[in-house]
């Protein structure tokens, strides 16, 4: 069985590298690290990851929620938001994209891996077909 593909979208390089190392150690294939929404959309279009680990506040014009919205126009990967934001407006916008989970930083690495496993299991073969 091929390893599940995960795109890490995080503008803090140190955090992104730590997440990438943990994911690789757990047997996942990290398709890339994106620091901007534009880079996330481009990476997802070419690699079709099974899951997006998405920060909300990113460098550039597009935040993580908008990036997920654009990616979901093409196909429906599982989504886990990993962010420091927890205000009601941001959470409402994020929940409209139907993520599997919304983890607030700092988070326990074990919890992240549990959420990833559950999201991939619930999404069936890794990614759901695009909605009409």
Regions found by a protein language model. Give the residues of each.
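Conserved acidic carboxylate
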Residues: 10
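Two-component/phosphorelay signaling modules centered on CheY-like receiver
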Residues: 13-32
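Acidic, metal-coordinating helix/loop segments flanking the phosphotransfer/catalytic sites
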Residues: 20, 33-51
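Acidic catalytic/metal-coordinating carboxylates
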Residues: 36, 62-66
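Active-site residues of response regulator receiver
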Residues: 55-56, 83
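Short amphipathic alpha-helix used as the core "switch/output" element in two-component signaling
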Residues: 65-77
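Alpha4 helix (beta4-alpha4-beta5 surface) of REC/receiver domains from two-component response regulators
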Residues: 86-104, 114
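C-terminal output helix
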Residues: 89, 107-117, 124
């Amino acid at each position: 069985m091929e390893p599940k593909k995960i795109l890490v979208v995080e503008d803090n390089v140190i955090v992104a590298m730590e997440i990438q190392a943990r994911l690789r150690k757990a047997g996942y294939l990290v398709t890339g690290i994106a620091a901007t929404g534009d880079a996330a959309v481009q990476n997802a279009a070419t690699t079709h990851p099974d899951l997006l680990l998405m920060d909300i506040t990113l460098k550039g014009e597009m935040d993580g929620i908008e990036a997920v919205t654009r990616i979901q126009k093409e196909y429906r990967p599982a989504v886990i938001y990993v962010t420091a934001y927890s205000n009601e407006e941001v959470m409402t916008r994020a929940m409209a994209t139907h993520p599997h989970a919304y983890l607030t930083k700092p988070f326990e690495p074990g919890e992240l891996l549990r959420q990833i496993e559950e999201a991939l299991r619930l999404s069936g073969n890794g990614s759901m077909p695009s909605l009409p």
